[in-house]
């Protein structure tokens, strides 16, 4: 480590109102300061929620760490030594961190620290905030000094805090999930500089978005997965849908809550009317195919043939070579522009050649919505936060723009321990 870095201290969890002068005034009590900076967003000029303090005497860093917790401008701040080991790699197994979901809007970091001290020594508390609305987004993270404390608190799963039920899950970084993350971002420290919203911490049992591409976008249909299975990942924006339909969790209950590859938007269903953990099941498959209502006969006869394969305003797929629906054996183009041979007459149990397997009651390809583990909340986290609050017209949890925790001003506290100045 360079000599001028030995006395540098990273300070995270700063209030939006904390200035460089306030930060320097607070830490000067621990020793002479030779440099102090609050990191700001280049575009908006607003604080990013973290900064750096450099002491003339490096021993003052330990003095600060031994005299916590520290509170500045009404927030519990998080000072850490600024060195490569602490800033680049978290402890294996998640750093004894837990996720807290469904937090009351009036709970503070001090309240959480006081409450969870009964389970063991708390080393860090972070509540996610919406910078625009200046209020809690209803979830956060808490770190313990001992792993046994994490096991103890997660065994309860739910606790009652300020009259509201709060969910507790063990949090682990995505880089410990077998390298399945398709985003080219790295986890840096407890709150590293990331390419996605917040950090790559999520519940240890939740899978990575099955259809996630670069930068959190949907990357295409997963391999070896039947297309058109009902109740699968409802609410996600597909290929050809409008941004208004993009959701993270349960979608609208009407047809068209997600679209297929290149399919035009269907009719929009009613807005969600639920909170907590329940969501309506859906019976449509990808691309607007109504698999439960499909018949087992051969080629559909026109747009309404069979009443099934094209029920949600998709272009007819059943035209033969001459353009006449059901005009006998020939070829047609499916939703992927692949030529298909249509069979005439006689029952068919699989639909058109190259088509989707039949689903419905009694078929193994059909599952209920509750059997799927929805990996919501953008691509940074592996769980669905939209179930913690009642939505009103928008479904992304917290109603704030998606951003990288520590790289944008839309979340609180957006600081990144992997960036040294």
From Swiss-Prot:
Subcellular location: Nucleus; Cytoplasm
Compositional bias segments (type: Polar residues): 240-250, 275-284, 406-421
Any Pfam family the entry gives: RRM_1
Biased composition (Low complexity): 293-302
Biased amino acid composition, Pro residues: 264-273
Function text: This protein is a component of ribonucleosomes. Could be needed to organize a concentration gradient of a dorsalizing morphogen (Dm) originating in the germinal vesicle. Interacts with grk mRNA (via 3' UTR) and involved in its localization to the dorsal anterior region of the oocyte during dorsal-ventral axis determination; may function as a ribonuclear protein complex together with sqd and otu. Required for polytene chromosome dispersal in nurse cells during oogenesis. May be involved in the regulation of splicing.
Protein's name according to its UniProt entry: Heterogeneous nuclear ribonucleoprotein 27C
Species annotation: Drosophila melanogaster (Fruit fly)
